[in-house]
């Protein structure tokens, strides 16, 4: 018989032996014709979730709210399954409720795990903020990870300096406005994976960590990043400098009053300086410890930072800033250092009156490129003038728009650059004002919870690092490089995903989104990149089958 049906003798006797055992074990059943069960087999997750679903429904949770809670408990059950369970248990549909009634729900008591290094075992989980993981390739590719490891920032017994910095960046990149509301992130596994942790630390840890940071640590870290930007060609020959006011809304008698353009008045605040590259959008330098007594010398401090002891570092050729940034004596110092400057001269009453009396034939009509591939017609007066405290003559370019606006007066020590390029170069300085405004809004620098300058300086440093990661990401997204950080977050970064940790790779299955195909395409060049802080695993980005 075994030979007839192609079995070996030993294999056939094993089949007979197993059949006899089943006859003894299931004597009441037909051994040949067994009924086939109808419908889908019940999943293990649905069985485990039944009690949770019933418990939450008794607290008037909707199907959507129950789904969110089950996901946080690691029970991947669909909304349809939840509805089926409720129907089987005899629950009717919830009555129509006002928004206020929905927000009065008793929150489920979920014990958040203690933050620690991720185990990186084979597992699957969901995350509501997994989109930030698309920034990790840029951290590794550009060598930013090494700068974090070599920085002087503190670490703890369980969380290294790399994991600590990545934890702050994870919150910044996720548009978290207040660190005190840790229930927004302390159970999200995807945000924890970004920092190679099981989950991000609680709010108390972030507060405690920032108390241990010094200004020297921030300066050292920015210096390391500065070298990366220079080596990668992300810093051109021009730097736009500007002050920004970081308001503090508590009691801060030790703080100075600084003018806030957005509020239209002076506020008790901290004054910070930023240096912005107009071409790449990279913010290269920041310092939140600027006082009224030394604000004029900030331009020289930035010059020292840029050269970092290397006087032959001649990449930087132009500094662009407004009229209140420094004084004429420091302009003279820049000129001696061989640095070209572009700035606005303050329009005194006598100066404006003299320009109004200049003959019309001395004004030159110029065409300046504007946004939207358009051009603007202006009139310019190019002349040489003397300034108090400045040795020699300086170039002065006065521009007006056919009498419709007051004259703007640009002064520079560059005598070779055409007038059109002088005006265009200064006009691009407004990009730094736009970048600062966006950064304050998106990274919530206008909501600082401490009046300690060092803590704000650290917060500003982390904001800059995250901003630069957004710029690197945006540069890769075709036709989206000009988007603000807020729009990049909304259109690309803000996304949930199913995450699978495997032996050699971590699979990120991002939910359907309009720009998802572009993200997956631009992540392909990084598919073979290994991440040392994630066990040298690779990260592969895919699209999920649902939105």
Question: Which residues does each predicted region cover?
Answer:
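Short, basic interhelical loop/turn and adjoining N-cap
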Residues: 3-14, 71-84, 157, 188-205
């Amino acid at each position: 018989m075994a030979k007839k049906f192609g079995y070996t003798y030993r294999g056939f006797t094993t089949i007979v032996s197993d059949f006899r055992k089943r006859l003894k074990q299931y004597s009441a059943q037909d051994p040949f014709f067994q009924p086939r069960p109808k419908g889908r087999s019940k999943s293990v997750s649905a069985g485990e979730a039944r009690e949770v679903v019933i418990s939450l429904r008794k607290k008037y949770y909707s199907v959507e709210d129950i789904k969110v809670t089950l996901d946080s408990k690691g029970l991947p059950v669909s909304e349809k399954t939840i509805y089926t369970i409720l129907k089987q248990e005899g629950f009717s549909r919830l009555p129509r409720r006002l928004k206020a009634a929905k927000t009065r729900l008793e929150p489920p008591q979920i014990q958040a795990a203690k933050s620690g290094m991720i185990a990186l075992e084979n597992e699957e989980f969901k995350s509501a903020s997994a989109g930030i993981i698309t920034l990790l390739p840029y951290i590794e590719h550009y060598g930013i990870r090494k700068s974090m490891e070599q920085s002087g920032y503190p670490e703890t017994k369980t969380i290294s300096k790399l994991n600590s910095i990545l934890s702050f960046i994870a919150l910044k990149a996720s548009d978290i406005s207040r660190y005190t509301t840790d229930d927004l992130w302390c159970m999200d596994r995807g945000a924890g994976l970004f920092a190679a942790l099981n989950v991000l630390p609680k709010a108390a840890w972030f507060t405690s960590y920032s108390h241990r940071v010094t200004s020297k640590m921030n300066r050292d870290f920015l210096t390391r990043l500065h070298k990366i930007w220079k080596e990668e060609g992300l810093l051109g020959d021009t730097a736009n400098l500007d002050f920004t006011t970081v308001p503090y809304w508590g009691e801060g008698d030790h703080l100075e009053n600084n003018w806030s353009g957005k509020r239209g008045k002076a506020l008790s605040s901290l004054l910070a300086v930023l240096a912005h590259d107009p071409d790449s959008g990279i913010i290269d330098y920041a310092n939140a410890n600027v006082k009224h007594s030394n604000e004029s010398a900030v331009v020289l401090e930035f010059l020292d930072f840029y050269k970092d002891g290397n006087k032959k570092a001649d990449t930087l050729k132009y500094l662009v800033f407004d009229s209140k940034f420094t004084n004429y004596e420091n302009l003279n110092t820049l000129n001696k250092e061989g640095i070209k400057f572009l700035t606005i001269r303050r329009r005194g009453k006598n100066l404006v009156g003299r320009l109004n009396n200049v003959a019309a034939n001395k004004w030159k009509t110029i065409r300046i490129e504007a946004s939207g591939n358009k051009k603007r017609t202006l009139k310019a007066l190019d002349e040489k003038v003397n300034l108090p405290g400045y040795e020699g003559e300086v170039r002065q370019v006065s521009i007006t728009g056919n009498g419709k606006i007051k004259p703007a007066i640009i002064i520079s020590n560059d005598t070779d650059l055409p007038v059109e390029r002088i005006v265009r170069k200064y006009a691009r300085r407004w990009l730094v004002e736009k970048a600062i405004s966006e950064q304050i809004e998106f990274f919530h620098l206008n909501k600082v919870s401490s009046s300690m300058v060092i803590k704000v300086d650290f917060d500003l440093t982390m904001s800059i690092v995250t901003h630069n990661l957004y710029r690197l990401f945006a540069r890769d997204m075709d036709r989206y490089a000009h988007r603000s950080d807020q729009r990049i977050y909304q259109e690309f970064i803000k996304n949930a995903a199913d995450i699978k940790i495997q032996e050699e790779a971590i699979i990120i299955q991002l939910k359907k989104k309009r720009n998802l195909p572009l993200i997956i395409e631009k992540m392909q060049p990084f598919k073979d990149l290994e991440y040392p802080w994630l066990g040298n695993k690779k990260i592969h980005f895919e699209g999920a089958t649902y939105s």
